[in-house]
């Protein structure tokens, strides 16, 4: 198992892309808390069943920015918290997130996660599902140990909402009758709910009051929506090294994301027939991904998706208007910009 300090870099490195500077600044501001969170993650991955820490360490070693736990840590400190409860809750948030990744990769039959072989590709589907269950259980142990019914309500509700979002995505898969509102319901559930809860519990442990908790919940929700919109755009616009997974996975899986919806509705009858064949009937040839990329580019669906994301990022920033100016507040504002800069 890796030492805790290896889990995340909290300082900018020469290899960091410019758009990552915002997250590096946020990480630096909560560096001591983040190190304590990393230690808690390692400690709580421990199990006498050797496969559990081995598989969990594999996905942890694959990297990731620890954005969600950083949001919990930063939200608590923004609200003036001086205790340590937020550290365990940040680890809880990361366990929920990691469990969903393990389950998602099995459902999606993904071979890559963050540029490395996915856990299911290395350890198998059964092990990935069961270790994901273990991490969910660990997360709930941490909630109970915290002792706050408010925290338990927020994070358990988020876990249920994530599952609902994933099921809704399954229902809408291969369905071009899905509208933009339904698509947004999917990403609110599967992605944004945990962003929102991560921020909200930071305010709750600080005892800042309902207004602050609601503002941070809104910040996290809109940040998460923007993040997922950009993620869905990148699946049709990024290279594999940047994306960390195979480009075009959403297309091959028949996922109905906003770039596809926009291109489909703007397309000619011939173009719509292409989308019906490849997405609805899942009849895809070796040249179809390239044609899909060309249609999405023709109708500027990536640009339109990023424009939608920018609107949610601005809304996230507006949610922080009631907090006094500080380096932490600025870092959270910059984190919203980071979500957009990933697409540039």
Which residues make up each language-model segment?
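All-alpha prenyltransferase/terpene-synthase fold signal
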Residues: 1-344
């Amino acid at each position: 198992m890796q030492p805790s300090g290896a889990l995340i870099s909290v300082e900018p490195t020469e290899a960091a892309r410019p758009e990552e500077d915002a997250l590096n600044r946020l990480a630096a501001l909560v560096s001591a808390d983040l190190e304590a969170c990393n230690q808690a993650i390692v400690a709580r991955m421990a199990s006498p069943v050797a496969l559990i820490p081995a598989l969990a360490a594999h996905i942890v070693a694959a990297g990731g920015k620890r954005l969600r736990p950083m949001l919990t840590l930063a939200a608590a400190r923004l609200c003036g918290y001086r205790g340590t409860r937020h550290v365990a809750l940040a680890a809880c948030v990361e366990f929920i997130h990691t469990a969903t990744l393990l389950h998602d990769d099995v459902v999606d039959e993904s071979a890559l996660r963050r540029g490395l072989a996915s856990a299911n590709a290395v350890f198998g589907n059964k092990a990935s599902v069961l270790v994901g269950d273990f991490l969910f259980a660990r997360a709930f142990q941490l909630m109970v140990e915290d002792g706050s019914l408010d925290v338990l309500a927020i994070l358990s509700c988020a876990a249920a909402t994530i599952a609902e979002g994933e099921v809704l995505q399954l229902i809408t898969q291969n369905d071009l009758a899905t509208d933009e509102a339904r698509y947004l319901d999917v990403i609110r559930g599967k992605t944004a709910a945990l962003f929102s809860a991560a921020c909200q519990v930071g305010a709750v442990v600080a005892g800042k009051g309902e207004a602050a908790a609601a503002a941070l919940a809104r910040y996290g929700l809109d940040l998460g929506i923007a993040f997922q919109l950009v993620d869905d755009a990148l699946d049709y616009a990024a290279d594999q090294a940047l994306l960390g997974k195979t480009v075009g996975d959403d297309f091959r899986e028949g996922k109905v994301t906003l770039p596809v919806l926009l291109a489909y509705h703007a397309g000619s009858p011939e173009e719509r027939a292409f989308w019906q064949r490849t997405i609805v009937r899942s009849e895809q040839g070796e040249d179809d991904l390239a044609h899909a990329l060309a249609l999405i580019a023709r109708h500027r669906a990536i640009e339109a998706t990023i424009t939608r994301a920018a609107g949610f990022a601005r809304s996230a920033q507006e949610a922080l208007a009631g907090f006094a100016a500080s380096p932490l507040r600025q870092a959270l504002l910059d984190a919203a910009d980071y979500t957009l800069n990933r697409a540039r």
